[in-house]
Amino acid sequence: MVRLASVNVNGVRAAFRKGMQPWLEASGVDVLALQEVRAEREDLEALLGDDWVIAHDAASQKGRAGVAIATKVSHDEVRVDFGPKSVDTAGRWVEVDITTPAGNPLTVVNCYVHSGEAGTPKQDAKYEFLEIMTKRMAELGASDRPTVVVGDLNVGHRWLDIRNWKGNLKNSGFLPEERAYFDTWIGHEDSEDYNLGTGGRFVDVGRKVHGEVEGPYSWWSWRGKAFDNDTGWRIDYHLANAPLAATVTDYRIDRAPSYDTRWSDHAPVIADYDI
């Protein structure tokens, strides 16, 4: 069994100061995918310790973005080159091939999609990234190798994924054009092959496990009573191809017990894979 946790840490050093380390020690995680690391590799090594093997892709601007995958086993291969050099994708995509303790191949992809802002160059950059991501997703989906794409994808695919979806129809994160990319990766919710992982598509593990329910959410604003009232967004995902999705034994969003015990505005998304 491999337990994989993905979380946007909003700066890994700050997260550890606020209580991430006790959570990690108690989590039983074998593979840890972090987004918005905002730190150097040396910082990760110092915080995580010698038990972890780390693959890290830093952003081109210091103190921005950054993704990392840490595992308890060695890496067979690491890939960070993503898309044309004319597009700055640094700090947003890293792939790691490992062999699980049971001797099975596994590819873990960690992704941090731009937050965007409707009608601005930030949104243009988000679409540019999503286009490149879609091409790579098709390549990954064409392989039978067990593969999962995790991370903060900064889009709610369906109305079930956002508490206040009607008020966000014109906002980045729930724009029709953004959600259409998820239709390509997972299938449209009204299609017969939705979320089955057929035809090179992926399975939204969270939706597969929880079914047609609102949420459960993975992000809540720090402002107001959003966390206490569970006014959240489900924008953090495990997207597994069919061979891997068939091995899922457990999935949960590890929501903090209270506002003051949070160490990020995102909650870890954890899945167990029998592989």
Question: What are the functions of these language-model segments?
Answer:
Residues D51, F129-T231, I235:
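Metal-dependent phosphoesterases centered on the DNase I-like endonuclease/exonuclease/phosphatase
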Residues M1-G49, V53-A55, A59-V67, W185, ...:
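N-terminal, active-site-proximal structural segment of metallo-dependent hydrolase catalytic domains
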Residues L4-V9, M20-E42, V108, R136-W159, ...:
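Active-site beta-strand/loop signature of hydrolases that rely on acidic residues for catalysis
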Residues R252-I275:
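Surface polyanion/phosphate-binding segment centered on an Asp-His-Pro turn
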Residues G83-P84, V113-L130, G167-S172:
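Surface-exposed cleft-lining segments at the edges of enzyme active sites
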Residues D57-S60, P84-S86, A226-D230, Y259-R262:
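Short Gly/Pro-enriched turn/cap motifs at secondary-structure boundaries
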Residues R38, D43-G116:
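Structured beta-strand-rich core segments of catalytic domains in phosphoester-bond hydrolases
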Residues K62-V78, E214, D228-T247, Y273:
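Conserved beta strand-loop-helix elements of the APE1-like EEP
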